Amino acid sequence: MQLRKLLLPGLLSVTLLSGCSLFNSEEDVVKMSPLPTVENQFTPTTAWSTSVGSGIGNFYSNLHPALADNVVYAADRAGLVKALNADDGKEIWSVSLAEKDGWFSKEPALLSGGVTVSGGHVYIGSEKAQVYALNTSDGTVAWQTKVAGEALSRPVVSDGLVLIHTSNGQLQALNEADGAVKWTVNLDMPSLSLRGESAPTTAFGAAVVGGDNGRVSAVLMEQGQMIWQQRISQATGSTEIDRLSDVDTTPVVVNGVVFALAYNGNLTALDLRSGQIMWKRELGSVNDFIVDGNRIYLVDQNDRVMALTIDGGVTLWTQSDLLHRLLTSPVLYNGNLVVGDSEGYLHWINVEDGRFVAQQKVDSSGFQTEPVAADGKLLIQAKDGTVYSITR
């Protein structure tokens, strides 16, 4: 069982009472699979690398780079935000969102959700329940808004709204122009949950989001009204971990079908209009997944990389040689599936059969957030803050 969020400091969103058992026995402690031997069919190379502050260290974070108009935007947990030239990684501008604490020291901003770029703004959320909109031109703060709780997932911009899913189960819509809160929807919270929240996805005027209560919700964006809720995961089992029912992955909407994935299961297809379940498959994950054509690509809670059909979730192939290597979410790049791991490797996988086609050691601090593929570039940020541009 994948416990990446539980193994890092402070990752349960409630304090466990003494005497609670997280594990059944010592047998539940898993070992990382050894690095598989791969004969590279091509040689991935690092085009450039640039340091962006001190990164995230051993804290859970959803910070990853964003690319727009040939500029890469990246941040670290302390509050440093940089704009970099996408061709060579050279700095365009740099700002700090850390707050002054006395004459010489600064209080870290604890950035945690982002980066999102849209409409001339860079959006980032923080553990201090702040959402920032920076001007893409120079990094100045266009607006800053206090939200209902920690902003652990990336902001999502749609229809003039900035959608924020906070750690206490609130979905909030902010005005894109000035950050004013337009509406708030309570998604309910269980007594125990993983640290991290589902980023919403938008389609046909609705925001679709997963919740820590095991439900997927559709909300009318114009007024903030609940359209439907559907449970896809039940809190069952003999241990606290077995009973975690979080839906922390971002739903995907394709042709009127919502695909959603919960930590302890299930992978579920729902009708966008009604929320009715069309099919479900017993799979679980905290990693975002991909729907491409007639296939679903995902990394499950044990770090199996899988391809499934969108019609019924039938398994097409499974790659099991990366078990418990704490993989990132997958990304499609140049016809291959790419995942990073906690030891700083990138693994390139053939989408047709799941075989490895290349492997690259990139960074010694390791990866936690997924690579980003955009405009023909592959970007990834390591835990120490270094941003890499990879080519093949």
Swiss-Prot record:
Keywords (alphabetical) are: Cell outer membrane, Lipoprotein, Membrane, Palmitate, Signal
Q: Which residues are annotated with the lipid modification N-palmitoyl cysteine?
A: C20
Q: Which PROSITE patterns match?
A: PROKAR_LIPOPROTEIN
The molecular function terms in GO held by this entry are:
identical protein binding
GO cellular component terms attached to this protein's record: Bam protein complex; cell outer membrane; membrane
Q: Does the keyword Lipoprotein apply?
A: yes
The membrane-topology field of this record reads: Lipid-anchor
Annotated function: Part of the outer membrane protein assembly complex (Bam), which is involved in assembly and insertion of beta-barrel proteins into the outer membrane. Nonessential member of the complex, which may orient the flexible periplasmic domain of BamA for interaction with other Bam components, chaperones and nascent outer membrane proteins. Efficient substrate folding and insertion into the outer membrane requires all 5 subunits.
Which HAMAP family does this one have? OM_assembly_BamB
Query: Cross-referenced PANTHER family, in alphabetical order?
Result: CELL SURFACE PROTEIN (PTHR34512), OUTER MEMBRANE PROTEIN ASSEMBLY FACTOR BAMB (PTHR34512:SF30)
Similarity section: Belongs to the BamB family.
UniProt protein name: Outer membrane protein assembly factor BamB
Originating organism = Escherichia coli (strain K12)
Q: What is the lineage of its organism?
A: Bacteria, Pseudomonadati, Pseudomonadota, Gammaproteobacteria, Enterobacterales
